[in-house]
Design a protein with these regions (language model features):
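A short acidic, Gly/Pro-enriched loop at the edge of an enzyme's catalytic core
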Residues: 99-108
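Acceptor-substrate binding/catalytic loop of class I
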Residues: 141, 148-164
Length: 164
């Protein structure tokens, strides 16, 4: 018997169950600024990677990329994008609390706009990101601050989901 879909997984599957790529297929601009960290031989983890635009880009630069997302639909689209671009990415369906945060495994961990985690989940997530980094590794993090609420241009509307 299949495991029942969790409520968050269902929400994200519904969001990603569309033919187009919600955020496009080009990498996040902030991540592109960090291009030098994704050279061949670097082991990279993309957390909550969505439809794969960032993981595919990093793999195209030669990085050895693992990526996970809670949404099966997002991972399916990520795998399709990787195949279209001719790159290899190790994709997994997982939530941040279910992921196997192996100690000192990655040179780079990327967390881009994981804004819907509760403060407690975010504390666990960030601790696990540090745990899974090799000594001297790099955590690349991008998220909204409380100032974003004034702009009303996207992101979460819950203050506790914003980074301080």
């Amino acid at each position: 018997m299949d495991k029942p879909e969790s409520k968050p997984a269902k929400v994200w599957n519904d969001i990603f169950d569309k033919p187009d790529y919600i955020f496009g297929t080009e990498p996040n601009d902030y991540l592109v600024e960090k291009k030098e960290y994704f050279r061949p031989g670097r082991k990279v983890l993309m957390v909550a990677d969505g439809e794969g635009r960032n993981s595919v880009w990093a793999a195209a630069l030669g990085a050895d990329v693992d990526a996970f997302d809670l949404s099966e639909k997002a991972v399916e689209k990520a795998e399709k994008l990787a195949a279209e671009k001719g790159v290899s990415v190790n994709y997994f369906i997982s939530g941040v609390d279910e992921w196997d945060w192996e100690e000192a495994k990655y040179d780079v961990v990327v967390v881009i706009f994981v804004q819907f985690a509760t403060p407690n989940m975010r504390t666990r997530l960030f601790a696990n990101c540090i745990k899974t980094l090799k000594k001297g590794g790099l955590l690349i993090l991008q998220g909204y601050t409380p100032k974003q609420l004034e702009y009303k241009t996207g992101g979460p509307s819950i203050l506790g989901h914003l980074y301080t």
